[in-house]
Amino acid sequence: MNFYITTPIYYTNDIPHIGHAYTSIACDIIARYNKLLGNNVFFLTGTDEHGQKVEKAAINSNLEPKEFVDKLSVNFINLIPFLGCEIDDFIRTTEKRHIKASQELWKKLEKNNQIYLSNYEGWYSEIGRASCRERV
């Protein structure tokens, strides 16, 4: 059986912290367990180098966003062997292969009417970085 696992793709708005280590190790444990079961495992991790958080952090560091993420992504790349994790691939959202794959996926979804415009109403916490549901 094929088994695919990925960490969250980490934001490059700051250096790695204990949460990054926790999820990387947890995914590594699951990947290793599935290998022991005889599954064909593919373990991916990487960095999300887009978004307002990244842009704000770059501005605060007086760097261009691409220069900022290039410097920070190295910390995430180095985190994996430091933790003893065994991944199959590390991807950055600024890589050409990621951009190409994302565009191809978008086109497939669009062709199958899976992308549509809609309205959303609700509260969003910038501090918690989450949508908040109202209690009824």
PLM regions: where:
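N-terminal, positively charged nucleic-acid-binding surface of large information/translation enzymes
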Residues: M1-R135
